[in-house]
C-alpha cells in the first residue's frame, strides 16, 4: 500500500475568522489495530447511501407513474446501489438490504445478481415502505448506523418485526478482513468486492511448509487470525489468490 504521508486540509470558520488547519498522517505507522476505523466509516457510509436512495424515492411514492422503472434502475442511484454492495462485501457489513449475502445459496461470483438483489431490497423497503412497523425498524437501524462508534461484529439489526437479527455465523470479520462461508469454504471478501472469479493460483495444504511460511507472513502483518477459520480458506494475499486446504476440518 502507499505509505507516503497524507495531509488533510480543513478550512472553515474558527472564532469568527476563516482558518485553514493542516493535519499530516504517517501512513507507514498504520497497523491492523486501527482496522475498526475503515469498518466504522464504511458502516456510516452505507447508512448515508441508503438514506440518499430513500429520500429520492419519496417523490416517486408520493406521485407514482404507471410503468415507471424502479428508482434504483436510474443510473444516478444504480451507482449508489453498487457502492452499497461493494462496501458491504469488502467489510463484511450486513444490513436488512444486504442480509442475503449471508445466505448459503447466494452466488458471490455473480456481481450483477448481487446488485439486483440489493436493488430489490432497497426498492421494496427503503423506497416503498414508509409507514408502519417496517418503517420504524428502518429508522432505528439508520439512526444506529449513521452515528456508529463501536463495531457491530455480529451484524445485528432490527428486522421488520422489530426483532434483533444477529445470527450471521456465515460472515466473519477478522482484523481488517472479512470472510463469507460457502459450502465447506471461507471466501475472502476482497475476492467478491473486486469481482475476482478465477480459480485460485496457489493451493497450500494445512500444516505444510508453505502454510507455515504464509502464517509467518500473516503474523508480521498481524493478520494471523484469518487462519483460525475452520475448513478451506480462499484468501487474497499479496496479490495472489490462495486456496488453503484443510482436510481435517
Positions of predicted regions on the chain:
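C-terminal partner/receptor-binding element of secreted or periplasmic proteins
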Residues: 221, 225-249
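Long, folded non-catalytic interaction modules
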Residues: 201-218, 241-249
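An acidic, Ser/Thr-enriched
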Residues: 1-182, 188-191, 195-196, 202-206, ...
